[in-house]
Amino acid sequence: MEEIKKICLFFLASLYYQYLAGQNIFIPMDDEQKNHLKAYGLTYWALSQDTKAEWLLNYRGGSFLLDGYSSIEKECKLRDISFQVISENDAQKLRNAIAKPSVNAEIVELLTPPKIAVYSPKTAQPWDDAVTLVLSYAEIPYDVIFDEEVLEEKLALYDWLHLHHEDFTGQYGKFWNSFKYAQWYKKQVQEAERMALKYGYKKVSQLKLAVAKRIRDFTLGGGFLFAMCSATDSYDIALSSDGIDFLDWMYDGDGIENDPQSKIDF
């Protein structure tokens, strides 16, 4: 009886993962795609199922070409993603067209899904984190990490790091003038100061500089970094002003050193 169960399970699994011989699944990413974010998530899911994908850069919005498994076709339907089943012959014609020197496009073969980390505070903020909202909707798995994980060398566990609303200079986004009495701002300052003390730093700016350096080392080691919003500027400013006190008293308790601007090395 047990042997029959195993045979049945194997048969069902083979049906689910049945390869559509000589066929491919084309996922357009131009205006014909009705659910772009879900399409990215579907491609990630396909990679996690040990299926390779071809990313057709600069072709119809960066479309995807996947192996023609019935399970992938089923997922496309479940996630309401626009797709086409095309023959291997048509897929090869597409590859040949993109490979022409006169065509400004490229094919990148994707083999494994990246392990993603999002650098974001664990506590609630008065704005939405666009990165986590997008990844959650797309059904792309990720971990939320912050200063503790970065300083404890856990960045090495990931392939891709996202930065969103963050001020690596220790000025809390320069919200002091407008929100210094807001409870969320006070709590943010208290938590940052507590974190700095925990890791032996006298100032939050020193803590954030240490985090920025760890992120720099992560990218030098081959890690991918995607920064947006205030993270793009403040990350560079923090690294460029190492050892320079350009923060006023409301941010670190003391004044600005003499002529800090002339000492910053971009």
Q: What kind of region is each of these model predictions?
A:
Residues 228-266:
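An acidic, glycine-rich "communication" segment
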Residues 10, 20-21:
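Cleavable N-terminal signal peptides
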Residues 53-59, 145-148, 248-252:
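Surface-exposed patches in mature extracellular/periplasmic domains of secreted proteins
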Residues 1-6:
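Positively charged n-region of N-terminal signal peptides that target proteins for export
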Residues 25, 30-34, 64-65, 69-74, ...:
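Helical hinge/lid and interdomain linker segments adjacent to catalytic or ligand-binding clefts
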Residues 47-51, 120, 165, 222-223, ...:
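Sec/Tat-exported extracytoplasmic proteins
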Residues 21-129, 138:
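Hydrophobic targeting/anchoring helices
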